């Protein structure tokens, strides 16, 4: 206290020392404008007056002296010519033409100016006779005169309009300093016109009367100020005049002119205390951080804010204190703000100076002091008398200590299903939310070492502690139903402590985690998959969906969150920052695709539609929601309900009639309705009608009719002349049909020959197989998509039925992928060899992950089209995808596809062998085939693509697969498969069909993966060490075929299930006999050859024992 008083007592001495530093601004003449404009014409006579420049005085008695610069310059300050064309009267400031200028003068300057047709030059005019450098021309002691040099003669006097004679070409404004003697600052007349057109009379008169400080001479040629102006009273004026033009005739025209006049400021106003307050009191308690503003005092100055370069020199502030602790702890910061004040109904600029007393360092919670501080403020440019520019500000400061206190006890509930990093509550010392510069550390001391399920982390924003789940296993222990802790809060600087008890009650029951759920809730893009999964930070074990408002780019965007209470909220808190998977919407420093507004340092501040993130790949997407408004109102829904009710009644009546008819009518022999997984022996074909029901087979009368006797109606649109078709080598064959390579002449109007593939029946085929071929023919007529095999035509008359379809150069996708594995890096470099017949000449480059994703995307687009056409494929697999030139994917083998315009599912209740490992659960157990069961198969196809043609579920026999799938077992992620691709597979393998994505959504997800895919897939490195993945001991084509009696069948069938018997892609070069003779297990011999390595076919074909198991399920 004594030190502060003694410091204030020395104020008088300091003021005396500072007074000699006060000075006055230099005085001098100045120009009223910083630029003048006029026109020059070719052949203007020498001596033509051009314009006046005017100088105003700083003090009475000053006489101006004008001097021209030595050179003419271009607008880009290029020196063009020595100035011998323009002269000036050094006393009056009149500029006139020294010599007449011709076209050569203009051309000479134009060339030096870069050849621009519009030539503008300028020269500089200085005040005073002393020499100045031309590069230092600045207002107020120098001005520039610009001339538009026109390559034409002076216009005819009769061509001028009144506006041309009154209004200058360029806007004119004036600058007048306050408190200066009156003087002339403008000459109205355009001197060249007055000189060259004496018959035109132009006169002026001022408007506004005596209220304005301007006047004209008797002829009103020159305008002057009437008195010294005061900027603090009025800063801007408008000079208005009336221009009267009279020509040789009697007509007169008037034009009104206006010019702005700005009064420039000088430092003639002393600073004063704002509101008369020069003392401030402050208390330093909870805000103790360096940079904290302790108190503020304001100083008002009627003068304008100085330029930034002048501010530090003009205004100084000094902390007057002899206390070293105060000097080290506090500093003063000065910040001026321009403000407007009203004076006589005029807005005038002024300055409000803010002087802030700021902590120069952080203070500990134990610091305690009381002191008085004085700050000297000096306006060093003040032009008034004495020490009017000096003020002293006073600050009374009290620094108080801080005591740490916690409440006696805390109590929180926690859900047993909570995931790691789930936030359950906060602990906070008293007033912690007001702390700044105080560092508190929280710790938990558990009462039992077996129940340490919680952790605590200190929030740097409000010095609170956030409690979170750190060990989910401890939550599930029976003895940990009530967690007891001691919370200890410690000040890091002084080590002072306080503590309280904490009781956390564990509630709820455990739940089974969904298969295939991502680690982060933010990955989920759709509400159903969000709410059925959990993720890091979820307090309930399930993610929460936040539905946005859908209004453009908004902070309330739709997203999946562990807890909408904390995520996303635009702030990455202390818990969320521990793992990017908790809340990437707030914390991820990622690339954001789509409409968004990025957070200040991280996360998404605002987004468009639905925003989801992939933390491992550091990417976020904000895309529109796939939603539509209500399509039907209440009346519409009532009508639809009534119609559906009527339809249901009609269907029930129809079913009753049909059942009654079958009960009393003749029953033809039909196949068994039991679902078995074996194939009838050769010669007993299985087929379906277009409605999806089993046709009569085996002993059906129509199947005994020769194919040749069946008359096919001709379709002129698709009929192709048989003579124009030349058949070639066989590409693949099945039991009753084959595919051959062919050339077609003038196909679809094309010139020359076109390579095609032709599907046909073998001689042993029956009408059942012919109907299958006709069914595919009729189906292919309806489809047209770049990723579905294309029908060109058919030969249906005067011979066997031939279907002409698109030729796929590289065969099946499965063979293409496997052969790509064999290629390896050596093939890319040209050193490899190929023996496979599946690929003749593929692109000579190694497959990249982008290629594989592209294959999947193409297939998904084709399946999306088929789904929109209401077609179910039922056998989607890599073996049934063909690869055309340019690596174009083509969906083929529609022998099983069924038109579902009438019904969305096909129930298969017939005998026949099926591809178990590609089938959906509902197809295996309930015989239901829908577009969503195709989605399941597509997931297996994705697995085949990523593993380059691997066999699904390697090493697992089909009879075990049923129970594994039912209990939630799914294939594991292959080594070279991305997390995002594997998540898509798992979504396709959801047990409930309605929770699987549709093909449209799958296409969108694959499009994103294609954009993000950059790295090459190392085919050699991706080869699994387990040979089962690719061979299972045998290739799929070499698997044994057995009938219902376990009798082996000939290996002439394709590598698809038996209903695809017509168009398989088996190798035509297979040997006719087995290299190793085999006997049956029962010791009986067969008349059919087998192969030694024919066991893996069971990997996707169910054995008779499994068939019996499925019969049990049926019953």
UniProtKB/Swiss-Prot annotation:
MF (Gene Ontology): ATP binding; calcium ion binding; transmembrane receptor protein tyrosine kinase activity
Membrane topology: Single-pass type I membrane protein
Top-level class of the enzyme under EC nomenclature: transferase
Reactions the enzyme catalyzes: L-tyrosyl-[protein] + ATP = O-phospho-L-tyrosyl-[protein] + ADP + H(+)
Mutant lacking the gene: phenotype: Exclusive loss in nociceptors results in a reduction in nociceptor number and size with a reduced epidermal innervation, but increased sensitivity to cold and increased formalin-induced pain.
Glycosylation sites: 89, 98, 151, 156, 199, 345, 360, 378, 396, 450, 470, 556, 689
Active-site residue numbers: 875 (proton acceptor)
Keywords: ATP-binding, Calcium, Cell adhesion, Cell membrane, Disulfide bond, Endosome, Glycoprotein, Kinase, Membrane, Metal-binding, Nucleotide-binding, Phosphoprotein, Proto-oncogene, Receptor, Signal, Transferase, Transmembrane, Transmembrane helix, Tyrosine-protein kinase
Outcome, altering residue 1063 to F: Abolishes interaction with DOK proteins
Phosphoserine: residues bearing it: 697
Amino-acid positions noted as binding Ca(2+) 3 in the UniProt annotation, renumbered to this chain: 267, 269, 301, 303, 379
Ranges annotated as spanning the membrane: 638-659
Family per record: Belongs to the protein kinase superfamily. Tyr protein kinase family.
Note, other: Treatment with withaferin A (WA) leads tumor regression in medullary thyroid carcinomas (MTC).
Name of the featured protein: Proto-oncogene tyrosine-protein kinase receptor Ret
Source organism of this protein record: Mus musculus
